[in-house]
């Protein structure tokens, strides 16, 4: 995409995360600093556009909401746009349900994981073998309102399950370090259910699933890391696969609701690809959305 933007006459400044893990606050700071660095070395741009994928899309969202006077438009792709808590709840509920139906298969639990866990040999392969050996619980995990794993076929659904479990295994200790070891996932009052499965199937789940209660300071960290306000004052286009295996597509609808409540619906345009994957959106679709964003900013007419 960098080459395509350059050929279209745009200068590009970009930043990676300076640390591993859920470094959303640092990502926001570093990316925002780019504009000042660019101005000091090259000159003040006539227009500035934000582009980001996945966690980077959340960075873009935060900057668009927080500094609308410094950016003209934003393209947020496959992003954590419903907020950090929404993503944590998705992953945490997936792990909690997996542990209920497949006890003892994986190390640790929702809020505990051994250091230096092997994501392939300790998470992915044991989970895959457990599911393939007993597929009966899979729909109860996949179709729960709290998870709704992406996929139209069993292989896609299993892939989404494994992605969530590996994501959890690699990220939970980082998250706990950021909350000083305090629990940030809360299912203490969650009633597990599904729009596709009778409630009776979830009676044992609701009676016996492991419960966790988040602490107020951990909730405060979530709120600061980043929860969207919906106060979107510049044009934004979102692009997301409908069956995203890692960051659920419904993040976009959660953000739409926040934008609607803030009275900023005119500034948000949602687009999707009816396919399975994560961020592999393709250059043509990406550039089309970017070009449409530029046209929107220039003309004031929403595509």
Question: Could you say what each language-model-derived stretch is?
Answer:
Residues 1-12:
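Short amphipathic alpha-helix adjacent to the substrate-entry channel of hydrolases
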Residues 46-105:
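Primarily recognizes the serine-hydrolase "nucleophile elbow" in alpha/beta-hydrolase
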Residues 80-227:
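Accessory cap/linker subdomain of secreted extracellular hydrolases
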Residues 232, 237-240, 244:
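Short beta-strand/loop motif that positions the catalytic acidic residue
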Residues 245-251:
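Conserved alpha/beta-hydrolase "acid-adjacent" motif
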Residues 267-282, 294:
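Histidine-bearing beta->alpha loop at or near hydrolase active sites
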Residues 285-303:
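Catalytic active-site module of serine/aspartate enzymes centered on a nucleophile-bearing elbow/loop
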């Amino acid at each position: 995409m960098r080459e395509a933007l350059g050929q279209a006459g745009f200068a590009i400044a970009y930043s990676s995360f300076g640390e591993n893990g859920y470094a959303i606050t640092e990502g926001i700071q570093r990316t925002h600093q780019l504009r000042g660095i660019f101005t000091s070395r090259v000159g003040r741009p006539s227009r500035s556009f934000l582009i980001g994928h996945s966690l980077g899309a959340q960075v873009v969202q935060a900057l668009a909401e927080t500094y609308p006077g410094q950016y003209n438009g934003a393209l947020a792709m496959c992003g954590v746009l419903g907020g950090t808590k929404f993503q944590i709840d998705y992953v945490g509920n997936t792990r909690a349900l997996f542990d209920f139906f497949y006890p003892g298969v994986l190390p640790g639990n929702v809020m505990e994981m051994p250091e230096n866990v092997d994501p392939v040999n300790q998470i992915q392969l044991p989970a895959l073998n457990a599911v393939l050996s007993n597929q009966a619980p899979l729909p109860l995990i996949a179709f729960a309102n709290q998870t709704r794993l992406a996929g139209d076929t069993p292989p896609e659904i299993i892939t989404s399950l494994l992605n969530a479990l590996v994501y959890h295994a690699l990220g939970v200790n980082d998250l706990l370090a950021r909350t000083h070891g305090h629990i940030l996932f809360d299912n203490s009052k969650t009633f597990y259910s599904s729009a596709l499965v009778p409630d009776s199937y979830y009676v044992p789940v609701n009676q016996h699933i492991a419960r966790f209660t988040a602490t107020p300071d951990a909730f405060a960290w979530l709120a600061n890391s980043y929860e969207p306000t919906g106060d979107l004052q510049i044009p934004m286009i979102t692009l997301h696969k409908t069956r995203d295996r890692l960051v659920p597509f419904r993040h976009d609808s959660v953000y739409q609701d926040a934008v609607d409540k803030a009275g900023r619906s005119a500034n948000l345009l949602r687009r999707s690809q009816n396919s399975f994957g994560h961020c592999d959106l393709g250059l043509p679709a990406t550039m089309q959305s970017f070009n449409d964003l530029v046209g929107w900013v220039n003309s004031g007419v929403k595509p």
